[in-house]
Structure formats: structure tokens, C-alpha cells
């Protein structure tokens, strides 16, 4: 693929990365002044966002215009589907039928891609073909292309966030003992069960950092900005603020922990010879104070680590500790 950079356009921030082998040659992050995802912005807000990104590209002195951009998981349909063993034409028909039942958009307004993950070599009983399917509403992909064209960039590819996360963490993933990538964003949280080159399951929870900040704001009667600062400073530390912050955030984190346990148990039941061995935290929520020890205690035999896509890379020192917020944009910047 020709040289390009990756851009991750989130509802609260925009991240840009250009990577050249082991070197990060350009990196930047700015706040999204609208605080919205692209699909609920007015035309004026889209133009203002495009101007923001133009200035961002100019500031980091990016020479090329080719870009690969992500579409948030909340705006796409992505799922692993299982079908009886059948021919490729039959499989294509079965996937189309399944999508027609599952996706709340007319078939002519959805762009679909799929890849066979696992196909039995021999049919013994009720073996299934495992297929990873992604469907993007055409209005969504059109909106992202139009925004990038407003910025005068050349979109080479749009993709959901999961492939970028897998590429970013490929060096530490294993097909024998899969990991759960816990992508803690502002608007939502993704849980992706993955091996090195294989996805076993993906789940999206419609709550993230914004929900936790609002809980803190309500509990302590604070403005949202101050609540965000409190959340970052004290987090899940039981010995801070007499444990009050811990008590506010605990139900949210317990919910996450419960989902992780369900995923791990379901995988173990299906793969007797293997087990989930690690949770990789990424996204802005990965920095929550006290999160790792709390999850480690809750999950018992599963290791919990912060995933750093910048590990082993040459990157500007001021961004070195911010790897988790750049995971998607870094994954987008890597050649397929």
C-alpha cells in the first residue's frame, strides 16, 4: 500500500499517526470541539471539524494526503456468525439473508464485507463455518468520506476499529491463548476476544468515560470538567476521598468485569484445550487510577495489562506515555 497516515475521529478527540517501520514520524491529538459523533453533527459543525483537522494536519507537517480512517464500532454492525458447512455461493446467500434480518437498514443502503475465520476440513457432526461480518450503513461511510474530502485528504480505506486494534497489538497476541482487548473509549467500550490473526468474538457496551464522568458529577455535585479531573485523579483507589469515588465507579467496573468473565467462560466451554490468559486495556479509560489492581483481583487467573502500541517504537518523548489513546490511529497507519 502507498504511504499513508491513520486518523481516528472520535466524539471527544481526533488522533493522527504516521508510522514508518519502527518510527512514528507524525503524531498529534486534539479535542473534538463539537463533542459529537459525525452522524449527529450539523453541516456547520462538520465544516468546523474539517477546519480543525486541516489545521492539525498542517501543524504536524504531513506531506501526503492519503489516509486510512476508522468508523466507530457504535456506527457499524460487526459480528461473528456461524453457519453449517456449505459452498461459497451458498455462504454468501446465507450471510445476506442473516444481515437482512439483523441490520436495521434497507439492504441497498448497507456496505458489507466478510471473511471466513474457520472452516472444518472434515465434516463430523455439527461443525460450523465461522465468519466475521461487518456491515456499514452507506450514509455513515458517505459522511466520513465527505468529511475527509472537506479536509482535502484522499481516503484510501475506511474500516471499523477492530482490525486496527488487532494490527496494533499483533506483536503480543497469540492464537493459542487469546486475549481480550478492552477498548475503553469516551462513548462506549469494546471487548474483543482475539488471537494473533483471528477474532473469536466482539462485543460493544454503550457506556464509557463520559458515563463515568456524569456519575461522578452527580455524586459530588460537580461541574462536568471538574468531575472528569476528579475521576482521573482518584479513580478506583479505595483509600482516596474516603472510598466515595470508588463506590461511585465500582458498579460500572463490576459490569465490565462481569462481561469479561462471561466471554472467558464461553470461550473455555468451546475450546477445552485453551483459555483466555490476558486482558489488554487500551483507550483513554485505560489510565483510570486503580483499575488494573481492581480488575486483577476480580478476574483472578487472568492477567490485566495496559496495552502500549508504542512499545519498541521511536516516538516523540512527549507522546511516549500516551500510547493507549493512539492504539486505533496507530493500527490504521500500519500497512496491511
Briefly describe each language-model feature range.
Residues 1-33, 65-72, 171-201, 205-211, ...:
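Gly/Thr-rich phosphate-binding beta-strand-loop-beta motif of the actin/hexokinase/Hsp70
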Residues 1-98, 102, 142-144:
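Non-catalytic, solvent-exposed interaction/assembly segments
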Residues 34-41, 138-165, 197-240:
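Glycine-rich phosphate-binding loop plus the immediately following alpha-helix
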Residues 53, 62-74, 148, 153-157, ...:
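Short glycine-rich phosphate-binding loop at a beta-alpha junction
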Residues 71-171, 309-312:
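Active-site neighborhood for divalent-cation/phosphate handling
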Residues 164, 286, 305-336:
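Glycine-rich phosphate-binding/hydrolytic loop that grips phosphoryl groups
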Residues 218-219, 229-278, 285:
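Adenine-nucleotide phosphate-binding core of ATP-dependent small-molecule kinases
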Residues 274-302:
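Glycine-rich phosphate-binding loops at beta-strand->alpha-helix junctions
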Amino acid at each position: 500500500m502507498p504511504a499513508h497516515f491513520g486518523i481516528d475521529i472520535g466524539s471527544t478527540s481526533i488522533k493522527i499517526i504516521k508510522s514508518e517501520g519502527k518510527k512514528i514520524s507524525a503524531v498529534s491529538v486534539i479535542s473534538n470541539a463539537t463533542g459529537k459523533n459525525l452522524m449527529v453533527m450539523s453541516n456547520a459543525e462538520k465544516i468546523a471539524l474539517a477546519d480543525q483537522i486541516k489545521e492539525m494536519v498542517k501543524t504536524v507537517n504531513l506531506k501526503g494526503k492519503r489516509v486510512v480512517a476508522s468508523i466507530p464500532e457504535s456506527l457499524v454492525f460487526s459480528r461473528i456468525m456461524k453457519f453449517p458447512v456449505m459452498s461459497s455461493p451458498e455462504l454468501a446467500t446465507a450471510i445476506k439473508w442473516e444481515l437482512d434480518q439483523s441490520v436495521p437498514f434497507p439492504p441497498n443502503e448497507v456496505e458489507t464485507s466478510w471473511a471466513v475465520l474457520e472452516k472444518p476440513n472434515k465434516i463430523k457432526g455439527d461443525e460450523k463455518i465461522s465468519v466475521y461480518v461487518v456491515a456499514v450503513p452507506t450514509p455513515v461511510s458517505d459522511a466520513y468520506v465527505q468529511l475527509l474530502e472537506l479536509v482535502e485528504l484522499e481516503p484510501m480505506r475506511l474500516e471499523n476499529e477492530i482490525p486496527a486494534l488487532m494490527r496494533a497489538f499483533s506483536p503480543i497476541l497469540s492464537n493459542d491463548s487469546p486475549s481480550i482487548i478492552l477498548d475503553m473509549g469516551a462513548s462506549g467500550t469494546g471487548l474483543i476476544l482475539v488471537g494473533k490473526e483471528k477474532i473469536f468474538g466482539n462485543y460493544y457496551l454503550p457506556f464509557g468515560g463520559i458515563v463515568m464522568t456524569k456519575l461522578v458529577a452527580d455524586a459530588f455535585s460537580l461541574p462536568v470538567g471538574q468531575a472528569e479531573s476528579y475521576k482521573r485523579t482518584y479513580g478506583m483507589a479505595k483509600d482516596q476521598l474516603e472510598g466515595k469515588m470508588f463506590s461511585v465507579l465500582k458498579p460500572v467496573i463490576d459490569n465490565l468485569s462481569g462481561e469479561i468473565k462471561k466471554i472467558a467462560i464461553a470461550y473455555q466451554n468451546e475450546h477445552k484445550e485453551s483459555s483466555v490468559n490476558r486482558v489488554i486495556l487500551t483507550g483513554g479509560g485505560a489510565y483510570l487510577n486503580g483499575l488494573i489492581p481492581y480488575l486483577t483481583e476480580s478476574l483472578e487467573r487472568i492477567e490485566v495489562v495496559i496495552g502500549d502500541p508504542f512499545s519498541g517504537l521511536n516516538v516523540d518523548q512527549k507522546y511516549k506515555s500516551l500510547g493507549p489513546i493512539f492504539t486505533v490511529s496507530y493500527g490504521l497507519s500500519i500497512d496491511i
